[in-house]
């Protein structure tokens, strides 16, 4: 643990705040972390309060049960991270599928973020993230949408929200395409506490933009022949679009992919 702590401090000094880079403290999850490692992760968050912290929470029932065996003193999975000082507005918890009401309240009260990883959750059969319930509850959760680098099947946010739509539909709800595109732009920026820099086209924001082509493939072009509203075009991009629909990318106003 001490070596990991020292190495992390060195990486923070080297990279955090360099240009647009942000360092995230990343304990893999409670199962693979010793109490000493989690304690030192919490210490880093206290020493560097502007850092993000990302880890894994309540993905499947077997994982939850095993975690409780390893930390029998805890009320629940979330209580472990709370005990070590790893909750807060900069804390991002992947999955969060099987949260109890108490856990959801704790995450909400602390401002922590539940990260929706639909391609991973469907691929692994982990369960269905209750997006609308988490947003509508008396103590709503902050939510991000992500690919999950480990279990996800695609890095595209279009594909991510297409699978997210299916997860929500399996629970008898729908996700409006405007809500989908809000989630992967300003919604995710807010989840990262970076809405002052990214996520909008407001004056003063970094000019990070993606130009999408709703006629990128023959199937999309055919479907566009009957599209008459922006919501339909966005839904088409979400359900049929992928990396082929990306025409141009601008990072801080500079073209990353030639037009």
Question: Which residues are covered by each model-predicted region?
Answer:
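Metal-coordinating catalytic core of metallo-dependent amide/deamination hydrolases
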Residues: 1-94
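Conserved, mostly hydrophobic/aromatic
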Residues: 25, 41, 56, 81, ...
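Active-site-proximal loop/turn and secondary-structure-junction residues that shape catalytic pockets
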Residues: 29-31, 57-63, 97-99, 118-122, ...
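Structural detector of well-ordered beta-strand residues that form the stable sheet scaffold
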Residues: 53-54, 92-94, 115, 144-146, ...
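A general structural motif
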Residues: 70-75, 94-100, 122-127, 150-154
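His/Asp/Glu-enriched, well-ordered alpha-helical/loop segment
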Residues: 83-90, 131-222
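A conserved active-site cap/scaffold subdomain adjacent to cofactor or substrate pockets
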Residues: 99-133, 138-141, 146-147
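C-terminal cap of metal-dependent C-N hydrolases
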Residues: 206-259
């Amino acid at each position: 643990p001490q070596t990991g702590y020292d190495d992390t401090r060195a990486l923070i000094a080297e990279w955090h705040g360099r240009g647009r880079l942000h360092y995230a403290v990343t304990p893999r999850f409670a199962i693979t972390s010793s109490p000493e490692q989690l304690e030192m992760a919490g210490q880093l968050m206290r020493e560097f309060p502007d850092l993000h912290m990302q880890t894994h929470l309540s993905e499947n029932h077997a994982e939850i049960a095993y975690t409780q065996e390893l930390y029998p003193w805890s009320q629940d999975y979330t209580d472990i991270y709370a005990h070590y000082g790893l909750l807060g507005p900069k804390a991002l918890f992947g999955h969060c599928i099987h949260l109890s009401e108490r856990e959801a309240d704790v995450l909400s009260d602390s401002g922590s973020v539940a990260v929706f990883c639909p391609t991973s959750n469907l691929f692994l059969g982990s369960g269905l993230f209750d997006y609308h319930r988490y947003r509508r509850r008396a103590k709503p959760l902050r939510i991000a949408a992500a690919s999950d680098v480990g279990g996800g099947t695609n890095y595209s946010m279009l594909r991510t929200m297409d699978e997210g739509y299916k997860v929500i539909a399996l629970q008898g709800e729908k996700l409006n395409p405007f809500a989908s595109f809000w989630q992967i732009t300003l919604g995710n920026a807010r989840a990262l506490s970076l809405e002052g820099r990214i996520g909008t086209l407001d004056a003063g924001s970094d000019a990070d933009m993606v130009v999408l082509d709703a006629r990128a493939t023959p199937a999309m072009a055919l479907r566009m022949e009957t599209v008459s509203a922006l919501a339909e075009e966005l839904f088409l991009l979400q359900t049929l679009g992928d990396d082929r629909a990306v025409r141009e990318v601008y990072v801080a106003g500079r073209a990353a992919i030639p037009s």
